[in-house]
Amino acid sequence: MSTLSPSVVISDDEPGYDLDLFCIPNHYAEDLEKVFIPHGLIMDRTERLARDVMKEMGGHHIVALCVLKGGYKFFADLLDYIKALNRNSDRSIPMTVDFIRLKSYCNDQSTGDIKVIGGDDLSTLTGKNVLIVEDIIDTGKTMQTLLSLVKQYSPKMVKVASLLVKRTSRSVGYRPDFVGFEIPDKFVVGYALDYNEHFRDLNHVCVISESGKAKYKA
């Protein structure tokens, strides 16, 4: 029987790191409070998640389904590690990729109104091991909606990998199968996570400042 994998738990009082200790684009210098998860730590954790995914799902054709846009960096890096394991294993499995785009945020709040605004023909998921890759689980409503949609196509197995899971009172209780980091209820950006389409070009996961929220508010 499969079990949910453990995660790196970041405490509520985690101070983070001073911005001056890292390379931060100058145009964001006044918009961030701190670096929360450095890029190197993200990569090391992602490498281990790839091993966990292959152990759990590596016996059958995997379709990796990326949730755009925020999931694309984590998706690309996770797949690089999975492909390395696959090509260096005595027993490799075929792997394909697909993409879907959802929208549930306005400014820093999850609206609860889930819109599917992209995606290919999901009938290709039938009979496959499906790995859904997401950047962050906040309330969990978005992922529950997507899981209901995916399961209509009768995949052999569905697992979810999320780089981040937020501890929040708004959560519906959903937890993905593979989690990189469990974080406090802060609005984070970077490593492709955005605030109204800004900050995707940061390498690190950072906490946005109040002035940053005001500057880029929709």
Swiss-Prot record:
It is found in: Cytoplasm. GO terms for molecular function: guanine phosphoribosyltransferase activity; hypoxanthine phosphoribosyltransferase activity; identical protein binding; magnesium ion binding; nucleotide binding. GMP binds at residues 69, 134-142, 166, 186-188, 194. Its main location: cytoplasm. Pathway: Purine metabolism; IMP biosynthesis via salvage pathway; IMP from hypoxanthine: step 1/1. CDD domains: PRTases_typeI. It holds the Pfam family Pribosyltran. Keywords: Acetylation, Cytoplasm, Glycosyltransferase, Isopeptide bond, Magnesium, Metal-binding, Nucleotide-binding, Phosphoprotein, Purine salvage, Transferase, Ubl conjugation. Its cofactor is Mg(2+). One of its GO terms (biological process) is purine nucleotide biosynthetic process. Converts guanine to guanosine monophosphate, and hypoxanthine to inosine monophosphate. Transfers the 5-phosphoribosyl group from 5-phosphoribosylpyrophosphate onto the purine. Plays a central role in the generation of purine nucleotides through the purine salvage pathway. Homotetramer. NCBIfam families: HGPRTase. This is Hypoxanthine-guanine phosphoribosyltransferase. It comes from Rattus norvegicus (Rat).
